[in-house]
UniProtKB/Swiss-Prot annotation:
This is (5-formylfuran-3-yl)methyl phosphate synthase. The active site is at 27 (schiff-base intermediate with substrate), 85 (proton acceptor). It comes from Methanococcus maripaludis (strain C5 / ATCC BAA-1333). It catalyses: 2 D-glyceraldehyde 3-phosphate = 4-(hydroxymethyl)-2-furancarboxaldehyde phosphate + phosphate + 2 H2O. The keyword Lyase applies. It is an enzyme of class 4 (lyase). The gene is mfnB. Pathway: Cofactor biosynthesis; methanofuran biosynthesis.
Length: 236
C-alpha cells in the first residue's frame, strides 16, 4: 500500500521524504481537512522532493464554484504537483460534484496527461451536507478522474472508522476498482488501523496526524521516525 504524508512546509516535507513516504502531499491544515497551501510552497516542496517521488497538492475543501476551483487546480498543477486533490465540500449533489471535477480534470490534463486527479469526498458528509461518500466513485468515474478518495471534513479526533464501517469502506474500495481507478483513504487514521485498510484493498493511505508529534495535525510537526514506523506497517 502506498503512503501519502501531508507536510505543510519544506522542513516537514524533508522529514516525510527521509521517512520514506511515497507521496508528498502539500497541505495547509489551518484552512481545513484538504486546506490549500500557497503556489510557492508547492513549488519549493516539488524542488526539494527527489525525482521519481510524487508530489500531491490539496486545493481546498471547495465550494460549488467550478470556475474558481478549476483555476485553483490549474495553479497547483503549474506549481509542480503531480496529484491534484479536490475536497468536494460545498457540492450538494452528484451533478454538482461531477460539474466541478469534470472541469478540474479538463484543466489539469490540459497541462499534462500524466497528471493525476483525485476526487475527494468525506466519510462524515452528513455533518456538512455533502455528497454521500458512496457516490464519490461514480463522480470520479464520470468526471474522468484517476483516484476516488475519502477523508473526514471535521477534525475533532474522530477517525474515518467512526463514520463508516469497514464493510462500507470495502464497498467504496471495490466500486472504485470496478471503475478502473485507484482508491485513497484518509481521515485521522491511526497507525494501528492501517492493516484494516490494507486488508480491504486500499491503494493509498493518507496521514498527517499519525506522522506528527503528539499525534496533533495542527500543533504537531511531522517527524521522520514516525513516518518510518507507518511506512513499515504499509509495506508489511
Amino acid at each position: 500500500m502506498i503512503l501519502l504524508v501531508s507536510p505543510k512546509d519544506v522542513a516537514e516535507a524533508y522529514e516525510a521524504i527521509e521517512g520514506g513516504a511515497d507521496i508528498i502531499d502539500v497541505k495547509n491544515p489551518p484552512e481545513g481537512s484538504l486546506g490549500a497551501n500557497f503556489p510557492w510552497v508547492i513549488k519549493e516542496i516539488r524542488e526539494a522532493t527527489p525525482e521519481g517521488r510524487l508530489v500531491s497538492a490539496a486545493i481546498g475543501d471547495v465550494p460549488y464554484k467550478p470556475g474558481t476551483v478549476t483555476l485553483a487546480a490549474l495553479g497547483a498543477t503549474v506549481s509542480g504537483a503531480d496529484y491534484i486533490k479536490v475536497g468536494l465540500y460545498g457540492t450538494r449533489s452528484y451533478q454538482e460534484a461531477v460539474d466541478v471535477m469534470k472541469n478540474v480534470t479538463k484543466a489539469v490534463k490540459y497541462v499534462g496527461e500524466d497528471k493525476i486527479v483525485v476526487a475527494a469526498g468525506y466519510a462524515d458528509a452528513y455533518r456538512i451536507g455533502g455528497v454521500d461518500p458512496l457516490v464519490i466513485p461514480k463522480v470520479a468515474r464520470d468526471a474522468g478522474c484517476d483516484v476516488a478518495m475519502l477523508d473526514t471534513a471535521v477534525k475533532d479526533g474522530k477517525t474515518l472508522f467512526d463514520h463508516m464501517s469497514i464493510e462500507l469502506l470495502k464497498e467504496f474500495v471495490e466500486e472504485t476498482h470496478k471503475y478502473g481507478m485507484k482508491c485513497a483513504l484518509a481521515g485521522s487514521i491511526k497507525i494501528e488501523e492501517i492493516p484494516m485498510l490494507k486488508e480491504i484493498g486500499c491503494d493509498i493511505v493518507g496521514v498527517r496526524g499519525a506522522a506528527c508529534t503528539k499525534g496533533d495535525r495542527n500543533e504537531g510537526r511531522i517527524q521522520k521516525d514516525l513516518v518510518k514506523e507507518i511506512v513499515k506497517v504499509c509495506k508489511e
